[in-house]
Amino acid sequence: MATTAGVPAQSGARNGEWHTYGGDLGSTRYAPLDQINATNFSKLEVAWRFKTDNLGPAPEFNLQSTPLMVNGRLYSTGGTRRAVVSLDAATGELLWVHSENEGARGAAAPRQLSGRGLAYWSDGKEERILYVTPGYRLIALDAKTGSPVPGFGQNGAVDLKLGFDQDLDVTGAKVGLHATPVVARNVVIVGAAFETGANPKSRSNVKGAVRGFDVRTGTQLWLFRTIPQPGEVGNDTWERDSWAYTGNTGV
C-alpha cells in the first residue's frame, strides 16, 4: 500500500486582509470572518465612500478592480487612466495616488480603464505594489508612499512591449493586459491580452506570451510562448505554417 503526505487546503485570506486578487494564491476568494452574519446583516450601514470620478479625463463607467487590503490599508486601481490609490481602510482617507499619463500609447491600448487590480509583494522589510498600465508597462510602487521604485526597470517601470520576442510598435501595437500580475515568491508573472471580442479583426495580430520578472529589479527572467515555435512541443499542430503569422493568443 502506498501513501502520500497530505497537502493542506487553502484556508482563505487571513485576519480579514486580502493580499492577492483571489484572496490567496489558491484563489479561494474566501475569508473566514464571522462578525457579519444573518442576524446583523440588515443593520449594516455605509461607513465611507471613495469616488474615482477624478482619476482620469472622464468618469469611469465599468470599475472591475478588486482592492487589496494589507496592514489596514486598501490598494486599488481606478479611473480611466488606471490610477493606483491607497486608502485608510477604517476611514477611507486617501493616503496617496499614482497615475501615468501615457498619451497616444494609452489611447491606442486595446485594454483600457481600471483593469482588474494589482499585486502586492513584501520580503518583510520592503513592500511593493505592482500593476500593468493600459499602455502595457509594468510599474512597481513603494506601498507606503506610492513613489516608483527607482531600482526596478527604468525609474520604476518595465516596458512590456520590449523583450516580447517580437518587434512591436511601442505606441500602437495592439497588446495589453486587463488582469493583475501574479507574484510567486520573488517573481512577477505577466500575461498578454488583445482587443475584446470573439472575432479578431486580423489573424496576424501580436502573438501572446507569459513572462516572469524579478520583483526587485524588473529583469526579465523567462518567456513562455503561447504559440510554439519550430522545435517546441506542439508546433506541428499549427498547420500550414500558421504559427508564423497568426496571433491573438493571450493568457
Task: Identify the role of each PLM range.
Residues W18-G22, E60-G79, A83, A109-R137, ...:
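Repeat-blade elements of multi-bladed beta-propeller folds
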Residues G135, G146-S147:
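Beta-rich strand-turn-strand
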